[in-house]
Amino acid sequence: MEIGITYNSFARKKMLPEERELKATSLAIGKHLRKLGHHVHYFDMDNPDDIKALCQAKIEVAFDTCERIHDDPRGEAYTAALLEFLDIPHTRTSSFQIALGVNKVRAKLLLAYNHILIPRFQVFQNEEEELHPDLPFPLFVKGVACENSIGIDELSLVTNPQELKAQVHKINTLYNQPALVEEFIPGREFSVAILPGKTNAILPIMEIEFDDLPPHKRFLDYNAKWITHSDQYKRTVPIYPVNLTIEEQKTISETALKCFNIFGLHSYARVDMRYNDHTPYVLEINQNPSINETGSGYVHSCENHGLNYTEMIEALLENAAQRHQ
């Protein structure tokens, strides 16, 4: 088949760690698609000429890895919308669902409406707003639309009004968006990956182990995800298989599948949650989890399900083509 890969070239001298991974992912996907016998064409969504070429190309399926256009995260939904306008099947969920999930507040409201337990939260437009009395410290602060753990660091967990004001101010000014302030749920953290298909497959549950970290650092921040030489990265350990009872595994897996269905997703996704007092609290639904060939939690889950990287790429491609029939 003629396969198009929509991607970001990040054509600058110094790329950020997550940008290097995104670019490496698009190259790895192309390598494995060629291994499967497909013809691969790359389209840089930051390049107007490539966008024109995409509109004129005879592409049968697009493997969409684009996460932004000119550093604007809304470009993620724009790219999917363009592919839909061109009637090209693509590996991502729909542009509407992408746009819905980009804003964490909208996503939380939709989950709460459907009786999914989430951490209580409040949105701060500026640091002078009053904290709601129902939100006790400690609290967790992040941007309403930041992806890839951008804006999350060791100071994101706040324990008093002064720390809260400082973090809200940072999100408001540095990232030019409201701050999402939510109660910090203690307990264990799990990620549940979902492989799309005629019957969506719940992949083996992954636990993020923080036991080697002090209590005030037991969460995934930017360093833990991207800075491989950092202490946070080295001491944040993914665990397979998880030490859970059959009933606990069922509860966590069913919660993840409910979230997948609530959002009407039909492509690969991951649901992150905290498990405390025998209760799962959904933190986030990642409609575009990393599928980098090395180090990706989603890829590890596929491997634990019995799929190697090439087989995973083939499954995602086939799902995109079949959805369009």
Regions inferred by a protein language model and the residue ranges of each:
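ATP-dependent carboxylate activation and anion-phosphoryl transfer catalytic cores
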Residues: 112-115, 243-325
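Short beta-strand-to-turn element immediately C-terminal to the catalytic PLP-Schiff-base lysine
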Residues: 124, 155-160, 194-197, 276, ...
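ATP-binding N-terminal substructure of ATP-dependent carboxylate-amine bond-forming enzymes
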Residues: 1-90, 96, 125-131, 324-325
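Phosphate-binding site of ATP-dependent enzymes
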Residues: 161-248, 254, 281
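Active-site nucleotide/adenylate-binding loops and adjacent lid/helix of ATP-dependent enzymes
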Residues: 1-7, 55-58, 99-180, 185-188, ...
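A short beta-strand motif that forms the metal-chelation/ATP-contact edge
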Residues: 3, 61-63, 191-196, 279-293
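Hydrophobic beta-strand scaffold residues
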Residues: 40, 89-90, 118, 139, ...
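A short glycine-rich, hydrophobically flanked beta-strand micro-motif that places a catalytic Asp/Glu
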Residues: 45, 179-183, 190-191, 264-278
